Structure formats: structure tokens, C-alpha cells
Amino acid sequence: MAMPNFGDMMKQLQEAGAKMQDVQKQLEKLVSEGEAGGGMVKAKVNGRQKLLELSIDPEIMDDVDMVQDLVVAAVNKALDASAQLAQNEIQKAAGGMINPADLLKQFGGQG
């Protein structure tokens, strides 16, 4: 039985780590948007699951309950889109070697 080449394994791990760092930088630049109430509330998040922008139509500000519901819905839609985008980017970079859901959890995503 041949012994595994640990030098090659370490090199592959280092390369994978470098790829993942590149992916994390890319994810910060990718933006996903979610909206609710026919566009009355819009949320933008990046691929690292950080809320970047929230806009609310001033005409709905009188109805606090509706605004709260729409904000939650818009942010959740944006986060879902962002998580899918991040998973796709990680899969591309990993070439199928890493489970993207596990990696997202390590970097604070929903996974």
C-alpha cells in the first residue's frame, strides 16, 4: 500500500485556503436584493450576509406593523438570494471538494 504524499496534501490544502480567501473577498462585492410589498421595502445584502441598504417608501410609514412585516420579508428574501449566490461561488472555487453549507457556517452565513 502506497503512503500518501503529505507534502502534496499540504500544498493542496494551502491552495484551497487561498481560493477560499479569494472567494470571501468576492462575496463582499456581490450584492443581492430582496423586496416586499410590491417594492415598497427593498433590502440589499452582500455575499457575506451583511445588510448594506434598506429603503422604505415614505408613504407606508404610518402603518408600523406593515412596515415591520415588509422589512422582515425583504431582508429575508435578500439573505436567501445572497446565501444561494455564496453557495454557488464556493462550489465553483472548491471544485466539489468542500461542502459549501459547512463553509458558510464557518464564515457566519446561514449555510
From Swiss-Prot:
PANTHER family: NUCLEOID-ASSOCIATED PROTEIN YBAB. Coiled coil: none annotated. GO terms for cellular component: bacterial nucleoid; cytosol. Belongs to the YbaB/EbfC family. It is found in: Cytoplasm, Nucleoid. It comes from the Bacteria. NCBIfam families: DNA_YbaB_EbfC. Disulfide bonds: none annotated. InterPro entries: YbaB-like_sf, YbaB/EbfC. Keywords: Cytoplasm, DNA-binding. SUPFAM superfamilies: YbaB-like. Pfam families: YbaB_DNA_bd. This is Nucleoid-associated protein Cpar_0834. Binds to DNA and alters its conformation. May be involved in regulation of gene expression, nucleoid organization and DNA protection. It comes from Chlorobaculum parvum (strain DSM 263 / NCIMB 8327). Homodimer. GO terms for molecular function: DNA binding.
